[in-house]
């Protein structure tokens, strides 16, 4: 039992490591976009179901675009864009996708 606190510390450190964000670069990071969309759907006139549905649809679409190509992205793009998105504290797949597209444009084409 004397090792229990140390084990919990190691487990906690692993849970918050950058490697756990991308799950070994096989899957994109997981963001809870429901919270984001709920915040965006709360407008001056109250809750907008239409805004909520549009937000959810755009997040799902961006996630699917990211998921399809995630394993092919350079690790520095995966990590860099995830870190940039998390730094904004708005876990948003549309922003993550925009970052990925921007970073990929900066990579020079392979010589032929």
List the predicted regions and their residue ranges.
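Mitochondrial intermembrane space
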Residues: 19-112
């Amino acid at each position: 039992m004397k090792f229990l606190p140390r084990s919990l510390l190691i487990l906690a450190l692993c849970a918050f490591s950058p490697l756990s964000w991308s799950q070994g670069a096989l899957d994109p990071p997981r963001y809870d976009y429901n919270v984001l969309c709920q915040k965006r759907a709360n407008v001056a006139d109250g809750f907008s179901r239409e805004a909520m549905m549009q937000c959810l649809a755009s997040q799902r679409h961006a996630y699917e675009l990211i998921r399809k190509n995630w394993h092919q992205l350079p690790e520095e793009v995966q990590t860099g864009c995830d870190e940039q998105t998390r730094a904004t504290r708005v876990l948003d797949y549309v922003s993550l996708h925009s970052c990925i597209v921007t970073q990929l444009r900066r990579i020079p084409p392979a010589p032929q």
